[in-house]
From Swiss-Prot:
SUPFAM superfamilies: HAD-like. It is an enzyme of class 3 (hydrolase). PANTHER family: HAD SUPERFAMILY HYDROLASE-LIKE, TYPE 3, PHOSPHOSERINE PHOSPHATASE. The active site is at 9 (nucleophile). Keywords: Carbohydrate metabolism, Hydrolase, Magnesium, Metal-binding. Belongs to the archaeal SPP-like hydrolase family. This is Phosphoglycolate phosphatase. CDD domains: HAD_Pase. GO terms for cellular component: cytosol.
């Protein structure tokens, strides 16, 4: 099945390590768009951030935010869940670990907690979820710990975005660098891991870039365009 769209993680995939957008990735994205290949930004960040990034970067596809819990396309936002058990977990975390912190973006979020990974480790969060018998999962993105419902992930978000585009998810290639990109890999037709990605992501990739971070993201986009006959 021919790839007709590309979904891209943002942090670490089209950026420098400091999260600034990489010029080569920006050029590659605009090349893909000029060839009629829509780019979907897929991020754990807020829908507001993703919408702004899409405008500034110049992507035409839907944006998938909050690790799949929020989709925005043509000025319409769709939220796939709400938070309830997440707040139960957060209350218990604060009691036991007073120094634990959430992201400053939490007031804008509606689909999950984002906990700063320098204030607690993901295994501690997972143990507490199990102890409290909550129907939640904790995933380390490499930048933060995302806590959400099990059915909320980048894969389910991409599936919903594809409905809006009229595409089969197998017609999408996904590029990412974190553990939270695994769910995207499960639904798309072609998978690329950026060079600094964890071993488990690389093991499930069809292609691994030679370059890291945004330079690797650019390499991935050009690889897709060449492999599927766009250039």
């Amino acid at each position: 099945m021919k790839i007709k769209a590309i979904s891209l993680d943002i942090d670490g995939t089209i950026t420098y390590p400091n999260r600034m957008i990489h010029e080569e990735a920006l050029q590659a994205i605009r090349k893909a768009e000029s060839l009629g290949v829509p780019i979907m930004l897929v991020t754990g960040n807020t829908v507001q951030f993703a919408e702004a990034a899409s405008i500034l970067i110049g992507t035409s596809g839907p944006v998938v935010a909050e690790d799949g819990g929020a989709i925005s396309y043509k000025k319409k936002r769709i939220f796939l869940t709400s938070m309830d058990e997440e707040w139960i977990l957060w209350g218990e975390l604060k009691k036991r670990f007073p120094n634990v912190k959430t992201s400053h973006t939490m007031p804008d979020r509606r689909a999950g907690l984002v906990i700063m990974r320098e204030t607690i480790d993901v295994e501690t969060v997972r143990k507490l979820i199990k102890e409290l018998n909550l129907n939640l999962v904790a995933v380390d993105s490499g930048f933060a710990i995302h806590v959400k419902k099990p059915w909320i992930n980048k894969g389910s978000g991409i599936e919903k975005a594809c409905e809006l585009l009229g595409l089969n998810p197998k017609e999408v290639a996904h590029v990412g660098d974190g553990e939270n990109d695994l769910d995207a890999f499960k639904v798309v037709g072609y998978r690329i891991a950026v060079a600094q990605a964890p071993k488990i992501l690389k093991e499930n990739a069809d292609y691994i870039t030679q370059n890291e971070y945004g330079k690797g993201g650019a390499e991935a986009i050009y690889h897709i365009l060449e492999k599927f006959g766009y250039i």
